[in-house]
């Protein structure tokens, strides 16, 4: 199944044109961040935009993309089981509050400090464990929730 997925900045949710909304299957909202191991999102007026988008296209899926270039906190959050659980629980609270369809992880990049962020040699393994914990947490909440990730081409 082919899906058209687009990133939309949080501030632009209230300004999307009808034709753009109708052209998409999934919106990845850019970006939630990680603070003290928890997912946080500066979502001023986001509920209004999400409601308007769903009025135009009720089947459209909307997920919060967490991270982006230079977004720190993944390595620390993913390092322990407790940290992964805290991360996943905080992501779920945002999903519930805003009626989202899942979470996208945009960690650039596990195991490297290229973007000026903290890294650790265990990041690649912990990244997989973080995704698994997020999947488990969202599945326990509701079936069919999205867990997606942005990955590099190398």
What is the predicted role of each segment?
Residues 1-95, 112, 122, 133:
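Glycan-recognition patch characteristic of GH18 chitinases/ENGases
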Residues 3-9, 124-154:
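Aromatic-lined carbohydrate-recognition surfaces of secreted/lumenal glycan-active proteins
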Residues 60, 101-103, 145-147:
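Residue-level recognition of the N-termini of beta-strands and the immediately preceding loop/turn
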Residues 65, 104, 148-150:
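Outer-envelope exported proteins of Gram-negative bacteria
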Residues 95-99, 138:
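Structural motif corresponding to the C-terminal cap of alpha-helices
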Residues 103-110:
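Mobile, glycine-rich extracellular loop/lid and propeptide segments
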Residues 116-125:
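Glycine-rich tight-turn/loop motif centered on a GG-T
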């Amino acid at each position: 199944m082919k899906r058209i997925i687009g990133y939309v900045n949080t501030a632009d949710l209230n300004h999307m044109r009808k034709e753009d909304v109708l052209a998409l299957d999934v919106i990845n909202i850019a970006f939630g961040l990680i603070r003290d191991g928890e997912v946080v999102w500066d979502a001023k007026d986001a509920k209004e935009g999400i409601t308007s988008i769903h009025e135009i296209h009720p089947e459209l899926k909307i997920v919060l993309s967490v991270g982006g270039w230079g977004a720190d906190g993944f390595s620390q959050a993913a390092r322990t089981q407790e940290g992964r659980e805290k991360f996943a629980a905080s992501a779920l609270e945002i999903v519930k509050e805003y009626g989202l369809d899942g979470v996208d992880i945009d960690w650039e990049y596990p195991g490297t400090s290229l973007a000026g962020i903290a890294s650790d040699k265990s990041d690649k393994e912990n990244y997989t464990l973080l995704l698994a914990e997020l999947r488990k947490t969202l599945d326990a909440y509701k079936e069919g929730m999205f867990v997606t990730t942005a990955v590099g081409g190398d």
